[in-house]
Amino acid sequence: MNKLLLLILFECIIFLSCSGKGSLESEIPKVSLIIDGTFDDKSFNESALNGIKKVKEEFKIEPVLKESSTNSYLSDLEGLKDTGSNLIWLIGYKFSDVAKSVSLQNPEIKYAIIDPVYSDEPIPANLVGMTFRSQEGAFLTGYIAAKVSKTGKIGFLGGIEGEIVDAFRYGYEAGAKYANKDIKISAYYIGSFADLEAGRSVATKMYSDGIDIIHHAAGLGGIGAIEVAKELGSGHYIIGVDGDQSYLAPNNIITSATKDVGRSLNIFTSNYLKTNTFEGGRLINYGLKEGVVGFIKNPKMIPFELEKEIDNLSSKIINQEIIVPYNKESYEKFIKE
């Protein structure tokens, strides 16, 4: 009889031990990250990857990472769901529509999207979007470009024309015109964020036309432009994007218009993991005021006096004394004022 009681007691202990372990593991949320393209773009996607790496280090989690493309979005997101993910990050405006549809289909999963393009339609309660006033940082880099250009001709190289890239373009052009109303600006789009050779080809043409500074927002196409500037040498300059890209061509990159996707991702995810709260159904907007967009200071390329001018402009933007345009319509209005 005593042996039977001991056996039952032992089995109960084993059961409770296993149950406790399962509960503990289930309390640790699983985070996933899906991108369009590759993580090694040295700008936008890589910034998101760096942000999730910091979360991994802080919380000792193993995030699920997925490189995807348009035709695979739904199947890849279904795969992330099957991993047991509690929070799924979608990086880039191309996920705008699919983010809404999967959120509605899976109300038990939290979704967060970077750079969504939404109008006034409702956002599901389990979806949050993060948008950026990229035009504010680009305004500052445009001002710098107009001030340091030797030829009086500067350019913009974009990936795919649309709301996200246009914010960089028109902010940049507005800043340049604010610095020098006579500056000549040319803009080109290569129709892709993944075409390095197209970036090289268009950048080569731009430099041959007398443009000495190119601001890119073209993903891998921008990397191609950086390669061309580096090969051509002195007098051929680039303004990078999203993060500090100066390490790619220290003698040719004047500055970078930063949009710290990784930081915003890190802040939101860390708060979610610490508090287990998720405030969805909304868009969160970041700009200079929040310290998420800006520019990289570079004493080698940007004189101290010019840096002081930029700091003054930053304050005016933060205080809304300057409202930076973000599209063609607001840009045309801005330069007429």
UniProtKB/Swiss-Prot annotation:
Entry membrane topology: Lipid-anchor
Coiled coil: none
Covalent lipidation (S-diacylglycerol cysteine), chain numbering: 18
Annotated lipid attachment (N-palmitoyl cysteine): 18
Pfam families to which the protein is assigned, alphabetical: Bmp
One Gene Ontology term, aspect cellular component: plasma membrane
Signal peptide as annotated in the record: 1-17
Subcellular location as annotated: Cell inner membrane
InterPro entries: BMP_lipoprotein (IPR050957), Peripla_BP_I (IPR028082), PnrA-like (IPR003760)
UniProt entry keywords in alphabetical sequence: Cell inner membrane, Cell membrane, Lipoprotein, Membrane, Palmitate, Signal, Transport
Function: Immunogenic protein. May be part of an ABC-type nucleoside uptake system involved in the purine salvage pathway.
Subunit organization: Monomer.
Family, similarity comment: Belongs to the BMP lipoprotein family.
Protein name: Basic membrane protein A1
Organism: Borrelia garinii subsp. bavariensis (strain ATCC BAA-2496 / DSM 23469 / PBi) (Borreliella bavariensis)
Taxonomic placement: Bacteria, Pseudomonadati, Spirochaetota, Spirochaetia, Spirochaetales
